[in-house]
Amino acid sequence: MTCDNPSVWKAKMLLTCKIALISALGVILAALSANTYADDMVVNAKNSLEWNRKEAFYHAIGNAEAIQGKQKIRAESLKAFYDPETVERTITRIVADGNASFADENHNGSGQKLDYDARKETYVLNGPAAVISGPDGSGAAEKTIIFKRAAQIVELVKDAEIKLKDGRHLSGQEITIYHDETNNILRIAAAGNVTITQADGSKATANKADYNRAADSALLTGNVIVKDRETELAGDRAEVDFATGISKMLSDKSGGRVSGRFTRLKE
């Protein structure tokens, strides 16, 4: 079944999902203001809407968007899959293609493609140049960004980078961000050519890094180099206290040594 513009699909997500087709914007706005439709999902498009009963999905084409409460998904093409076994036709997944983006009350992100699992409350953004932002800063990845809303975890894969609002940058091949219940960063774990750059320009590099937001400190492991201007420390492990500015270089368990190179005093 195909519907040409103007037209709108309404689908209530999860247990209370209902499907309706509304053809006038004024009716949509009136419906959205009523408590009856408070949890409904509204899907609209510029060009057309298709209902594929065989494969159980609705297809919005041309500047498509899906809106439910404070959640919004946009793309050139959008497919909303539903569970055909339920009378309510519960929406279980949304696949968006072409300049895809999402936004909720705390985060927004974009990529070439987007896949949202409604039951797991998980967004998958595919690159190149996928990005996501939240209360503490923004992140980017060349391949994939996975945002697990229920677990409050963000995973960035390949050429990943985080820019925090306090001026710090962190990059690596893989970065995992853990949020607290207020959507602020609690912990960051990074692996693969990790670089941490401070607001003052000092840098630390390592194979892996684990940043503790509450303690404002990081544990760096594997080929660690901490550099501040002409001062450089090298070793297998390092503890960096960002609050005090103290960096402690530690040797590995095999008996390796740590080293330091310092600016020569002026004569």
PLM regions and their residue ranges:
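Mature-chain termini and adjacent capping regions
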Residues: 1-267
